[in-house]
């Protein structure tokens, strides 16, 4: 694989995720025509285009939500198959959708553990889905996740998500994606519904995520801020 070069002519880090020649049709509509890109660890790659350019289609293919007609994916130089959301999750590929997919009637801690709630010891005679949730461990994990992302505007992980600001909700959705042993995180227009101050906070958070050696894909329209 040919290495990329940065602005001073030094070899850039090797690609962590490589996408080659992805094609997708919806009937007579050719949504993707040989999409190619690559992103290294500790790098933010901006996927920028107008409505209808195929950004969301490509993102959903990577997340395993859409089938595709042709194309290849490589992770750490190894060819991988992505045919379902479970495949993507097993490879460490996570997505933060624009609608965030949060449960507004649950608190922050419950949202961060949704689907992987810690259970109390001593209940092994019951199926896991019937065991009581260890709320103290769930709260501790949520606090740790929020602290790692340096979300300073959130007063309590027991706050209901429905009462949070747009920037706080975005932070919770990002924390949930990052907390699943992910190596690639896709952000679907994370600043689209935010004001100037909240946009700045989210972009600063993306910077901090980059410094944790994640591969980040920032999906944006040309009119929205996406520089890091």
Predicted segments with their positions:
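Glycine-rich phosphate-binding loops of nucleotide-dependent enzymes
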Residues: 2-220, 224-225
């Amino acid at each position: 694989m040919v290495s990329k070069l940065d602005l001073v002519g030094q070899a850039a880090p090797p690609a962590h995720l490589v996408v080659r020649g992805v094609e997708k049709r919806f009937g007579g509509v050719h949504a993707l025509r040989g999409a190619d890109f690559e992103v290294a660890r500790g790098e933010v790659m901006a996927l920028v285009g107008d409505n209808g350019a195929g950004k969301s289609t490509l993102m959903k293919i990577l997340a395993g939500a859409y089938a595709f007609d042709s194309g290849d994916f490589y992770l750490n130089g190894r060819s991988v198959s992505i045919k379902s959301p479970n495949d993507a999750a097993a490879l460490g590929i996570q997505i933060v959708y624009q609608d965030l997919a949060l449960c507004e009637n649950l608190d922050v801690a419950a949202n961060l553990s949704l689907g992987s709630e810690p259970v109390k010891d001593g209940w092994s005679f019951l199926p896991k889905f019937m065991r009581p949730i260890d709320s103290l461990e769930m709260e501790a994990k949520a606090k740790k996740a929020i602290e790692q992302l340096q979300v300073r505007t959130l007063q309590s992980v027991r706050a209901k998500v429905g009462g949070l600001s747009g920037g706080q909700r975005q932070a919770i959705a990002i924390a949930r994606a990052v907390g699943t042993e992910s190596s690639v995180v896709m952000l679907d227009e994370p600043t689209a519904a935010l004001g100037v101050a909240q946009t700045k906070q989210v972009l600063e958070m993306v910077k901090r995520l980059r410094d944790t050696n994640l591969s980040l894909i920032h999906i944006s329209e040309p009119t929205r801020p996406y520089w890091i």
